[in-house]
Curated annotation (Swiss-Prot):
Organism per entry: Allorhizobium ampelinum (strain ATCC BAA-846 / DSM 112012 / S4) (Agrobacterium vitis (strain S4))
Record has Transmembrane as a keyword: no
Active site: 247
Top enzyme class: hydrolase
Name of the protein in question: Dihydroorotase
SUPFAM superfamilies: Metallo-dependent hydrolases
Annotated positions of the N6-carboxylysine modification: 99
Record GO terms (molecular function): dihydroorotase activity; zinc ion binding
Length: 350
């Protein structure tokens, strides 16, 4: 196959940051993606509908002229979150989901939930009104090995929560393990998972073999090869419970290349090209559209995009920049460590 035309994709997990960084990265998403669920872990975090509306306006103001892009806003769940404010956000259409960060699990998560019981009034209201909970599925207790955090979270936090509140709709974000895939597949309803571009491509060797390579460090951290292959099978299967959430997370290089570097990989600029390679390699190009354009909207109760994009397979590898320059500083672009031949040629208006 030399070309593939699909509905314009969406990104169901995206970090845009704010200020100069937002202005520097938004175009890499809006060029290809029609919508994205925007993560709320700013400093300070997006905890109220007023915060979300203000952030939404900043995002829209930064979208390059001519691009059509809709940010889908989320709230950062705290133990003080107001159920009424959450319901108002859902009613007005401002809020697409609420995000659960276990305290300390990832970048700017120190204000997250420590005692889930204190957040139950909000979760119960969300279940009642049909608002999804997006979860960063890792425990942060120091006695748990970092490579086991997801599996332990499922057993000790997520499964008990879903048994307690089975009507709550839950998105397991950036699934990284076969445990997570199997748990989603075992569920009857109200559970789905997003999968990142980079977790389909790298395993933990990318971070550790031949020296520490900080630009492959993210949270949840990449796991062993058997888990990567489980993610590949899920993503390329066409199963409607799995969809793209890039977790593209820009950090300026000095914050990555240091003694205690930040977690995050920047993939927005080359995600569609990388995914076309992955799906072609797994003989599943005909299911790429489901993963990037159809399954996510269906899960979140939205219509697929009317616009289309065309991917073309070039004879020569497509060149992507090693870094992008932003007003905040340089950001290294994800290197998949293979030649990329697929290119997004055109976005077609409906």
């Amino acid at each position: 196959m030399r070309s593939l035309t699909i509905r314009r994709p969406d990104d169901w997990h995206l970090h845009l940051r704010d200020g100069a960084m937002l202005e520097g990265v938004i175009g890499d998403t809006s060029r290809h993606f029609a919508r994205a669920i925007i993560m709320p872990n700013l400093v300070p975090p997006v905890v109220t509908t007023a915060d979300a509306e203000a952030y939404r306006q900043r995002i829209l103001a930064a979208v390059p002229k001519g691009d059509r892009f809709e940010p889908l806003m989320t709230l950062y769940l705290t133990e003080q979150t107001s159920p009424d404010d959450v319901e108002e956000g859902k009613t007005t259409g401002l809020i697409t989901a609420v995000k659960l960060y276990p305290a300390g699990a990832t970048t700017n998560s120190h204000g997250g939930v420590r005692d889930l019981d204190k957040a139950m009034p909000v979760l119960e209201r969300m279940a009642k009104i049909g608002l999804p909970l997006c979860v960063h599925g890792e425990v942060t207790t120091p006695e748990v090995d970092i490579f086991d955090r997801e599996a332990v979270f499922i057993d000790t936090v997520l499964d008990p929560l879903r048994r307690r509140l089975p009507e709550l709709k839950v998105t397991m974000e950036h699934v990284t393990t076969s445990d997570g895939i199997d748990y989603i597949l075992s569920a009857d309803s109200n559970l789905a998972g997003s999968i990142t571009t980079h977790h389909l491509i790298i395993n933990r060797n990318a971070i550790l073999v031949g020296g520490i390579r900080p630009h492959y460090y993210c949270l949840p951290v990449a796991k062993r090869e058997s888990h990567r292959l489980a993610l590949r099978r899920a993503a390329t299967s066409g199963d409607s419970r799995f969809f793209l959430g890039t977790d593209s997370a820009p950090h300026v290089d000095p914050l990555k290349e240091c003694g205690c570097g930040c977690a995050g990989i920047y993939t927005s600029i080359n995600t569609m090209s990388c995914l076309a390679h992955v799906f072609e390699e797994d003989e599943a190009l005909e299911r790429l559209e489901a993963f990037v354009s159809l399954n996510g909207p269906a899960w979140y109760g939205l219509q697929p995009n009317d616009e289309m994009i065309t991917l073309v397979r070039r004879d020569a590898p497509v060149a992507f920049p090693a870094k992008i320059e932003t007003g905040a500083g340089p950001v290294t672009v994800f290197d998949p460590m293979f030649p990329i031949h697929w290119d997004v040629e055109a976005a077609i208006q409906a």
